[in-house]
A protein has these predicted regions:
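Gly/Ser/Thr-rich phosphate-binding loop
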Residues: 92-98, 109-200, 214, 222-223
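AMP-binding/adenylate-forming catalytic core of the ANL superfamily
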Residues: 85, 238, 243-244, 254, ...
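Motif- and composition-driven signal specific to adenylation
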Residues: 15-19, 30, 36-38, 42-44, ...
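Conserved ATP-binding/catalytic segment of the ANL
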Residues: 204-214, 220-229, 233-299
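Conserved AMP-binding/adenylation subdomain of ANL enzymes
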Residues: 22-39, 46-96, 111-114
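Hydrophobic alpha-helical scaffolding
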Residues: 14, 18, 44-45, 70-73, ...
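Conserved AMP-binding A3 loop
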Residues: 1-23
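Conserved C-terminal "lid"/linker of ANL adenylate-forming enzymes
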Residues: 323-328, 339-340, 361-409
């Protein structure tokens, strides 16, 4: 039994079969091509799918994992960074593998950057899988900037996509130019198209689907497969897909028992597709994740991706703590209202809220053509997150709405 992270709803128990578990581990092994001797340092929580699969991989590969708790990492990111560095007792041909969410890149760069280039030796790092949340260009650049002179090869960073419903991995970048970022036209994105453009919205490639499964981008209304460059829901079909949700028959039917319509690929099965709830597109054999179906901010009939708005808010002011913004919509009298919740940076005070709010409003209006009804600042840790550390937009929206209703009574 593997529970979802709870970033979009209450955690659901996902029933992982032995077949799904073995299939996923084989898919990961084939995609990453592990080489011995190796070390696998990890701080991922063992109750989260990434942490569980890393632990099982250690068993399958016959490796002893170097485990620390998430608290150990968060209190001092250097503890994890130290383990990525080549040690005196490492074999000359050692390979180091690890797996992290995106926010760890910035934390490591900020709090564990070397004082001198020779403080670390990252030459043995073979792969850093980045998943669980959207991979951001600033996070990648900060990490490479901090550790590039210490022997870090940029191509070891591998943005990847997966979810509990498929046991874990769905895609990872296996090209030589990873990590790959493409900027997409914001207006086209709002219309369901992915069109590369200068000064657009940067998105990370999550690579190519793993072997031994079927994969399609599907129109959420017609259920037909969409061509390259069009945005739709990501559907997956294969032995890595879970059996369903525990004691949730209706949700199981809606998520795991889907029938695809017209297809463009040859040989696709008709039934038992898993609708992931994630929106994305494929362009030049690269998968790009654009958002969640249920997280879309729809104002005046236009689609806006919350992570895009959140990125704008973070870049608008140094008053905002990195990766600590929630953008969501709540019902209004005529149209939905855009709400922004942001945590203050560690060194920020309430006195700077007003100026930062003005900067955020101006940036969002300029870049997205909408104006937030509420911009609210909170202390660090004040924005709700899932058990995996991801911003829980729907939880924040529910709490915000409940608070408004309570205040009105």
């Amino acid at each position: 039994m593997q529970y979802t992270s709870g970033s979009t709803r209450n955690p659901a128990g996902v029933m992982i079969t032995n077949e799904a578990l073995v299939t996923d581990v084989l898919q990961i092994n084939e995609a990453l091509r592990f080489e011995a001797p190796m070390r696998i340092p990890t701080w991922l929580p063992q109750h989260h799918d990434m942490g569980v699969i890393v632990a099982i991989l250690g068993v399958v590969l016959g490796q002893v994992l170097e485990i620390m708790s998430p608290r150990d990492f968060l209190q001092n990111p250097k503890r994890w960074v130290d383990k990525l560095s080549r040690r005196g007792d490492d074999p000359a041909d050692v390979h180091i593998y690890t797996c992290i969410p995106n926010f760890a890149l910035d934390l490591a760069a900020r709090y564990a950057a070397p004082e001198t280039p020779d403080q670390y030796d990252f030459s043995a790092v073979d792969c850093i899988i980045i998943g669980s949340e959207s991979v951001t260009k600033p996070g990648v650049e900060a990490f490479v900037g901090a550790f590039g002179d210490s022997g870090l090869d940029r191509t070891v960073l591998r943005p990847s996509y997966g979810l509990a419903e498929t046991t874990l991995l769905v895609s990872t970048d296996r090209t030589e130019d990873r990590p790959k970022f493409v900027e997409f036209d914001r207006e086209a994105l709002a219309q369901g198209k992915a069109v590369p453009a200068e000064d657009g919205v940067p998105m990370a490639s999550n690579g190519q689907p793993v072997k031994w499964m079927h994969f399609a981008i599907v129109d959420t209304e017609t259920k037909n497969e969409l061509p390259e460059g069009e945005i739709g829901e990501i559907w997956v079909n294969g032995n890595n897909v879970a059996a369903g949700y525990l004691d949730r028959p209706e949700e199981t039917e809606a998520t795991f028992r889907n029938t695809i319509g017209t297809t463009l690929q040859d040989g696709l099965p008709k039934d038992n597709w898993c609708a992931t709830g994630d929106l994305g597109t494929v362009l030049d054999d690269h998968l790009y994740i654009t958002g969640r179906v249920k997280d879309l901010v729809v104002v005046a009939g236009r689609n806006h991706y919350p992570q895009d708005i959140e990125a704008t808010a973070m870049e608008a002011s140094d008053h905002v703590r990195k990766d600590s913004v929630a953008a969501f919509a709540v019902p209004g009298d005529d149209v939905e209202r855009l709400i922004i919740l942001a945590e203050r940076a560690d060194d920020a005070t309430e006195e700077g809220d007003a100026a930062a709010e003005d900067a955020i409003r101006s940036a969002i209006t300029t870049n997205h053509g909408i104006s937030p009804e509420v911009v609210e600042f909170r202390a660090p840790g004040g924005v709700a997150r899932s058990t995996a550390g991801k911003i829980a937009r729907r939880v924040n929206a529910k709490q915000f709405t409940e608070r408004e209703h309570a205040a009105a009574e």
